[in-house]
């Protein structure tokens, strides 16, 4: 997910995206814990996407 795409969204859409990413992260962590996760790099990518969304939410809250 690109930061430019996220910047075009409003706060409500970003909150929805954050919720979806947190759910996805939870599911990936459960798969990793049970040994079902084949592509472990997806955990890192989702974690960074969450950070991007949170950063943009903080920027929009300050503006």
UniProtKB/Swiss-Prot annotation:
Organism: Aliivibrio fischeri (strain ATCC 700601 / ES114) (Vibrio fischeri)
Lineage: Bacteria, Pseudomonadati, Pseudomonadota, Gammaproteobacteria, Vibrionales
Protein family per UniProt: Belongs to the universal ribosomal protein uL29 family.
Keywords from the named record: Ribonucleoprotein, Ribosomal protein
Protein name: Large ribosomal subunit protein uL29
Single GO MF annotation: structural constituent of ribosome
GO terms for biological process, alphabetical: translation
GO CC annotation terms, alphabetical: cytosolic large ribosomal subunit
Record-linked Pfam families: Ribosomal_L29
Domain of life, per lineage: Bacteria
